[in-house]
Amino acid sequence: MIEQDFICSDSFESSGIVEWNSPSNIALVKYWGKQDNQIPQNPSISFTLSKCYTNTVVEFKPKKNTQNEIHFKFDGKENQVFEEKVNTYIKSIDKYFGFLKNHDLYINSKNNFPHSSGIASSASSMSALASCLVDIESQITNNDNNFNLKKKSFISRLGSGSASR
């Protein structure tokens, strides 16, 4: 598949809540550096830590104002640094999700493991968020599960090079 395959201009107005858990991973052999679009410079080897995961809940509602609002909480608390990263990420992927133009997002994310502990929390959080966004989109498309899985991997990687694992 190529990048163009993942662009969805379909739009809709609806509200709802989606939730995903994504496992983290820890690298045995790390990649060093990235190419364009978060593609790792070299191969790496990592282990999935299925009992260490990020839980992300996304509530989506038709937007209230002319600009989209994206609210982010980590562990139930506002976190300005993480919110800015999430906003930047969502702006970078909005061409792949037509519904982002007319919806506000309320995102709450938490890990069941310590943040900044050497476990790839950015990978699991981007994977969980990407999975939520693809699930929202799947409410209006007829994409099959195989396509949705590939899109989740593609969108996850744009947020973190390790997230598509």
Describe the function of each predicted region.
Residues 124-132:
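Short amphipathic alpha-helical face segments that pack within enzyme cores
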Residues 31, 126, 165:
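Short, electropositive, low-hydrophobicity segments enriched in small/polar residues
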Residues 143-165:
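ATP-dependent small-molecule kinase catalytic core of the GHMP/sugar-kinase superfamily
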Residues 117-123:
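Short helix-coil transition sites and intra-membrane helix breaks within transmembrane domains
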Residues 1-117, 131-145:
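ATP-binding N-lobe of GHMP and related small-molecule kinases
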